[in-house]
Design a protein with these regions (language model features):
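Aromatic "clamp/platform" in nucleotide-sugar-dependent glycosyltransferases that forms part
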Residues: 271
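Conserved acidic donor-binding segment of nucleotide-sugar-dependent glycosyltransferases
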Residues: 303-304, 308-315, 324-329
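A short, well-ordered alpha-helix in the C-terminal region of glycosyltransferases
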Residues: 317, 324, 331-346, 352
Length: 368
């Protein structure tokens, strides 16, 4: 009687992607998460391994996902249970918060995992869970050298972090254009895009509002929302900027793309970005960027070529740069074209996926 052969043990690990939220209104962090999730799903299909997505929020995943709403504990328990099962898996987290579950697992039970480092979440003293999650990560992935340098005092183990800049693909934006809004705004305005949070007043909204009176005729469109919006609106009113500053609130992707197209430049002199995806959005749209010196923007914006880097606390310097761009459409156009070329060459989706591929190969056990 012939004896049936046992199936060979599985060599490769399935992927489990664990997300702090992928919703379209989640800002740059969620966009970066969608970028990671998409790459993981595409690589899993190529390698014929499983890819499961567990996420807070309600939507945004590039493949079927299990959503947990605001239930962080439920997400952590799901990630825990996946590792205690007999299944061979590797995990990719899209933020250090959900990765805290790894701190509670002893080494023999802990699956290989990747943790990305964005910025402010690691630029401060870390609790023991976050610190341990970073220390034991198989792969630590930083989105800029700036992020690593600012985080190093709080976690010296980051010496081994891989630096991989974020990217944007070229695609048609989702949603409908708010024609009434864009028609009202016209063209030739300055644009700042980002969340307005009272606990994160680092994006440069205040500095930009205080500079605007020094630039005669300049108009500013402020896109985004948050609990600090009311204060900023009051500040604009106090500065006598009625009619020159428009707060749009949250807008669709299609409306945002049209705002970029109609603007003269993106102006966001932020000191709190670990990278700054909005700079890539502007570059993709062929618009120059005005950003802060001594920030992560130095790794994205080529000073004098694709925009300007300024001392954001020097209103005269900022005003001079804004006035120069508004007075010279040819200069703004040339810088915008250079920015679009730089985006294609340095920050394309293909370049990002090529850099991420060997890191995920290591987690899954595939060798290219």
């Amino acid at each position: 009687m012939s004896v049936p052969k046992l199936a060979a043990p599985r060599k490769h690990r399935d992927l489990v992607f664990v997300s702090a939220g992928l919703d379209l209104d989640g800002g740059g962090r969620a966009l970066a998460g969608r970028l990671l999730a998409r790459t993981c799903c595409e690589l899993a299909r190529e390698w014929e391994v499983g890819c499961e997505i567990l996420a807070l929020g309600r939507s945004g995943a590039p493949a079927p996902a299990r959503y947990f709403g605001a239930d962080q504990r439920g997400l952590a328990l799901a990630a825990w249970r996946r590792q205690l099962s007999a299944r061979r898996i590797s995990l990719v987290f899209d933020l250090i918060g959900p990765a805290r579950v790894q701190a509670w697992l002893p080494g023999p039970l802990r699956a290989p995992y990747l943790v990305p480092l964005y910025g402010i979440e690691v630029w401060r003293p870390l609790g023991w869970e976050r610190r341990r999650a970073l220390v034991h990560a198989t792969v630590r992935l930083a989105i800029s050298r700036y992020t690593v340098e600012r985080a190093r005092p709080f976690c010296p183990e980051l010496n081994g972090a891989h630096v991989l800049p974020l990217a944007l693909e070229e695609r048609s934006p989702e949603g409908a254009v708010d024609l009434e809004l864009v028609s009202h705004l016209g063209t030739g305005f300055l644009l700042i895009v980002g969340r307005m949070a009272s606990g994160e007043q680092y994006k440069g909204h205040d500095q930009l509002l205080e500079t605007l009176p020094r630039v005669p005729g300049a108009r500013l469109v402020v896109t985004g929302d948050g609990d600090d919006r009311r204060r900023l609106q009051g500040r604009a009113s106090d500065l006598g900027l009625r009619g020159r500053v428009t707060f749009t609130g949250f807008v669709s992707e299609a409306t945002l793309a049209e705002l970029y197209r109609r603007s003269t430049a993106l102006v966001m002199p932020s000191l709190g970005e670990g990278f700054g995806l909005v700079y890539l959005e502007a570059m993709r749209a062929g618009k120059p960027c005005v950003a802060a010196r001594d920030s992560a923007a130095e790794e994205v914006v080529a000073d004098g070529a694709t925009g300007f880097l300024v001392d954001r606390d020097d209103p005269e310097e900022l005003a001079a740069v804004l006035g120069r761009l508004l007075a010279s459409p040819d200069l703004a156009r040339r810088m915008g074209e250079a920015g679009r070329r730089r985006w294609r060459e340095q920050f394309s989706l293909e370049r990002f996926q090529g850099g991420l591929r060997p890191l995920i190969e290591n987690l899954v056990g595939v060798r290219g």
